[in-house]
């Protein structure tokens, strides 16, 4: 019991000197001839009561009264505070790390907690220091600032129902926006066409010659480039194809050109669409033309080649050659 409660650094020499003083009894009190049974009459040196031992409040002994607990060495309070409290620069670095990162670092907290002990003073200091660090971090942490709003007004948002009413309402016209460049090009083309028409009208007014074809006025400019063509036998102006005649190529209409090629073109022949056609003198049938020629022969009027040519080419015919 004694060995377990004393520390190892206790001065044993002084302890045994005190024992010698206690053992120094006067000689008159001791009987020379005492037996074994008289041993109970001697006063006991060691007391079994714990009250004679130093109290728990003695600074040489620890505050733990359990017999099973290990012996503890007394250390002054100032030394404990120095060991428990880390240097100031360590705390500053920890606070800076917390300010830089929004989440607390577990490694720094573990390294900071290894300096702590189980004393109540250290627990109070640790709680106060942790509260100070949390207050500082809560003040220093920057907030998430959003982007500043611009002063430009936003366009008004139209409702979908209003848009549908405007598009699908009573007035179903759709407004199409045309780019300005396209409009400018279109206006330029219109101006060019107007200038060309003005030039043509000025040239026609300067010449002063107008022709009427089917009730339409034709400028002299167009009549000079494209003259009106007529068939030299029947004076037809419209035909699907112009053919070769006695006056050159493209001088006869299609019907007269076919008969001229086969040698059956006579003065009595006229197409039904010819403006010079008279039923008493002309016909578009080859049989009737042959009968008419036979009557003339029987009457004594002989038909010569000159008469054929005069019948072939009218005097008032307009000759147009490309």
From Swiss-Prot:
A zinc finger (GATA-type) spans 225-279. Disulfide bonds: none annotated. Residues 93-168 are annotated as: Disordered. A motif (Nuclear localization signal) lies at residues 147-154. It is found in: Nucleus. Belongs to the type IV zinc-finger family. Class A subfamily. This is GATA transcription factor 8. It comes from Arabidopsis thaliana. The lineage of its organism: Eukaryota, Viridiplantae, Streptophyta, Embryophyta, Tracheophyta. The gene is GATA8.
